[in-house]
From Swiss-Prot:
Keywords assigned: Cell membrane, Endosome, Glycoprotein, Lipoprotein, Lysosome, Membrane, Palmitate, Protein transport, Secreted, Transmembrane, Transmembrane helix, Transport
Record's keyword annotation contains Membrane: yes
PTM annotation: Palmitoylated at a low, basal level in unstimulated platelets. The level of palmitoylation increases when platelets are activated by thrombin (in vitro).
Membrane disposition: Multi-pass membrane protein
Native organism: Felis catus (Cat)
PANTHER family referenced in this protein's UniProt entry, alphabetically: CD63 ANTIGEN, TETRASPANIN
Record's subcellular location: Cell membrane; Lysosome membrane; Late endosome membrane; Endosome, Multivesicular body
Cytoplasmic side: 1-11, 73-81, 224-238
Function description: Functions as a cell surface receptor for TIMP1 and plays a role in the activation of cellular signaling cascades. Plays a role in the activation of ITGB1 and integrin signaling, leading to the activation of AKT, FAK/PTK2 and MAP kinases. Promotes cell survival, reorganization of the actin cytoskeleton, cell adhesion, spreading and migration, via its role in the activation of AKT and FAK/PTK2. Plays a role in VEGFA signaling via its role in regulating the internalization of KDR/VEGFR2.
Protein name: CD63 antigen
Length: 238
């Protein structure tokens, strides 16, 4: 028995949402990978809220893509089991995204404190490790900052002369510009406030995006349930 306009419209909107979910899934994976690459150069990798968040985002994105595919198959074939599975898994993803959003908000200051701790540790290793030198120099050049709190932090590094800072602190970076420097020729602001603040704000953006996607997924769940009810009633929505 064919269903008139209303259910056909629901099925069409569900297809549109499934395409949107696929796009969101790809976006989440891209954001997660990008965040992971950034965090590799800013905070110590380990089981911390800051470093685990990108992994969760990537996993949610991959799972959302798979669930969207299941939903598409279920809608095309009007398969009751597939649509129920789609609705259940989409509900789980929505709950995870809400949890990610809450975690991002709760741990926003934790990300900044982790960065502060790690940046100071990297400063201690700066003269001894070429990889650390590369990471710290890139951060100081890109964010136009110097030291943790400010440029004077470099004076407390054992293997650094008190009369110099890394060349990456200079406004105009040239070899040896950090030796016997003049304050007006270097960036005085510390990196913790600049980079940590940038990380904190981006965590909040990701949290807000997760809530936005979760809201759209609620619509997907509603439409899926409507289609499930129609299929269970023995209707055929062409």
């Amino acid at each position: 028995m064919a269903v008139e306009g209303g259910m056909k419209c629901v099925k069409f909107l569900l297809y549109v949402l499934l395409l949107a979910f696929c796009a969101c899934a790809v976006g989440l994976i891209a954001v997660g990978v990008g965040a992971q690459l950034v965090l590799r150069q800013t905070i110590v990798q380990g089981a911390t809220p800051g470093s685990l968040l990108p992994v969760v985002i990537i996993a949610v994105g991959a799972f959302l893509f798979l669930v969207a595919f299941v939903g598409c198959c279920g809608a095309c074939k009007e398969n009751y089991c597939l649509m129920v599975t789609f609705a259940i898994f989409l509900s789980l993803i929505m709950l995870v995204e809400v949890a990610v959003a809450i975690a991002g908000y709760v741990f926003r200051d934790k990300v900044m404190s982790e960065f502060n701790k790690d940046f100071r540790q990297q400063m201690q290793n700066y003269p001894k490790n070429n990889h650390t030198v590369s990471i710290v120099d890139r951060m100081q050049e890109d964010f136009k900052c110097c030291g943790a709190a400010n440029y004077t932090d470099w004076g407390s590094i054992p293997l650094m002369s008190k009369a110099r800072v890394p060349d990456s602190c200079c406004v105009n970076v040239t070899q040896g510009c950090g030796i016997s420097f003049k304050v007006k020729e270097i960036h005085e602001e510390g990196c913790v406030e600049k980079i940590g603040g940038w990380l904190r704000s981006n965590v909040l953006v990701v949290a807000a995006a997760a809530l936005g996607i979760a809201f759209v997924e609620v619509l997907g769940i509603i439409f899926a349930c409507c289609l499930v009810k129609s299929i269970r009633s023995g209707y055929e929505v062409m």
